[in-house]
């Protein structure tokens, strides 16, 4: 049997900021391999001009559904560019607790204001179903999973898809 040695490993994510203090440095020295970091895709938020052309108002909605940290960043970046003040009464629904904790960068974390599912979008829809009176906006990519919207439709949730 032929034994091959691996000398290079391609990591499909951005390079860590501090290479000396992360797990890749330890692996590199232990197994004598070199790590190459390459970001295969880059998600870019839309401009405020494109958002205005879509004729969606952030303030017409009483709740937001976040499926990633990137959607949180883009939502609040867009609100800032449009010079909108997000009301204190706005409710936030996050797919995981990690995304909910990330919200602390933008809003004060309150249990009555930020809700999250266990792990999947189906778990989150169960939480959302308890707040059917809200009007939701869901910031998402153009190629977002259709399953999200099917689950929301089946639960009879009023939402606007903001691409």
Q: Where would I find each of the regions flagged by the language model?
A:
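Conserved beta-alpha
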Residues: 1-163
